[in-house]
A protein has these predicted regions:
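C-terminal compact regulatory domains
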Residues: 1-2
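Long, amphipathic alpha-helical coiled-coil segments characteristic
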Residues: 12-62, 92-116
């Protein structure tokens, strides 16, 4: 199975992501690589540990937007919920959603890292 098939199996809407880029698979893969770098440098969980919710909102917004652009559906949906909860002053609930998505996110990120050509 190639990278895109593996991502599909994880719930990523690869076909929609490619459609957004007019079918340019090379560009899609390059942007997936950029997303990995962003996730590694923009981790939201430390902000929760330090009660830095303004910072968490900014990072979550960036992750949500990029995940949406790439149709990384599980990540996009979770960060949409996290943002909504943080913006309505529900950090405990947002942290619970983050805890659920982090293993899924890590699986997707690891898959991308391991399968980049």
């Amino acid at each position: 199975m190639n990278l895109l098939d593996k991502l599909r199996a994880m719930g990523v809407d690869v076909d929609d992501g490619l459609k957004r880029l007019m079918g340019n698979e090379k560009l899609y893969k390059r942007l997936l690589g950029s997303f990995v770098k962003m996730i590694r440098t923009q981790a939201v969980d430390p902000d929760f540990d330090e009660n830095e919710y303004t910072e968490a909102i900014e990072k979550a917004h960036s992750i949500k937007g990029t995940a949406g652009d790439l149709s990384l559906t599980p990540i996009y949906e979770a960060y949409t919920e996290i943002l909504n909860l943080l913006r309505t002053d529900k950090p405990a609930e947002a942290k619970a959603v983050l805890a659920k998505v982090l293993p899924v996110q890590e699986e997707i990120i690891s898959c991308i890292e391991e399968n980049m050509e």
